[in-house]
Amino acid sequence: RRNIITIFKGNDRYILEDTDVVLNKANQGVQTLERYKKVFDNKLSILNEYEFNDIVTLENVIVAIQRAEMVMRIVEDIQSQIYELGNDGRLVKMQLEELIGGVEKEELLIIKDYLAVTKKKKTPETVMEELSEIPYEELTKQVTVAKLLGYENFDNYDEVGVYTRGYRILSKIPRMPSNIVENLVLSYKSFQHILAADIESLDEVDGIGEVRARTIKQSLRRMQEQFVFDNIVV
């Protein structure tokens, strides 16, 4: 007879599987995560370039959020297996941390950039929580994500133009405090206005001196060049 370990908590019970079985599942999960992360990175790379060129559609935003959420759900499954593995899960944990760096933050900032202004006045964190709770089948529907972002139902989301506020891109500028990012967005309302602003104009924003204004302009120019390069098909 096999030795079986069962954990009880209240009316719930959980049967611990053999370590080799759990480790195999975790490794398979990491392989799946690598594929999903690659797709997310691709969608994010497209969004990066489109935001600079001001050609983002609602579909671009929805797909990026869907892919980020899919990645995070796989992460949750692997994390539960890591907990069960204990010390045997250290290598898997290291692989996981290396793979997912920044995905959750990117998703939150995408939502913050595109969350529609409605009477409900939802926060990006609230939308993130709502996304994590919907069934997978609903997550794959563009209308579901659009509704959570505060947009109405459209026949073709690829034909609905939207603009970014700029939180996500601006957060990539080195030594850029979140309060300065907030001041920029509040002052200019959209990323395109920030992109078009000259050094003198940026200098007038609270917390930004001439040195930081130059850093912002230079960093944005370098990022734009890099994002275009990233999407060149060889």
Model-identified regions with their sequence ranges:
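Long, highly charged, low-complexity intrinsically disordered interaction regions
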Residues: 35-51, 57-204, 210-234
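Short, well-ordered alpha-helix to beta-strand connector turns
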Residues: 2-3, 188
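Conserved phosphate-handling catalytic cores of large alpha/beta enzymes
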Residues: 3-56
